[in-house]
Amino acid sequence: KEKASEKCARAYANKCLARFPRGMVMLLLDGIRTEVNAKCNGSAAGHQEYLKHSSCMNNHGAKLHQCMRDLTQVLDQSVDAPTKSRLGLSCCSFNTYKTCMTGAVREPCGSGTAAYVDKLITGYAGDLLDTVCINFKAGTDACKTLPVLPKSTKTGRSASLLSPLARIVTSLNG
């Protein structure tokens, strides 16, 4: 299922995005591909690690999905923020997302699962975040001084992270 989703996302990026946003989305998709291959290859160490943590993560999936919905909603809203704040809001929201995800599993599943979730997110998005978000690290003044987005009553325009991420990167390019 994850591989089919990745294939669809790559087709969307190739067909619908200009060069710069396509490159940024592909960077994220490359990270996702690496992590998916590691956990789905039965002979890889990543597979055993995934199996070790997956049951508890599945039991607390509602919290994890809420973290993703919150991230998607913030990215959707960030597109409408002033241009100079968009990148920072997006980057800092990834920091909040990572904290949400690890927090969702730390107590019920243990610190090992929280570390695994942190590692997964870094594997998925680390190259993109290191490239684009270099000036917006967790807890820095750069994140603390950004405008606060108004609390939205919408459930979000997007069901997936790809579309708002592509809109953010496209809006930065022109």
Predicted regions mapped to residue ranges:
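Mature extracellular/luminal domains of secreted and GPI-anchored eukaryotic proteins, especially small
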Residues: 1-174
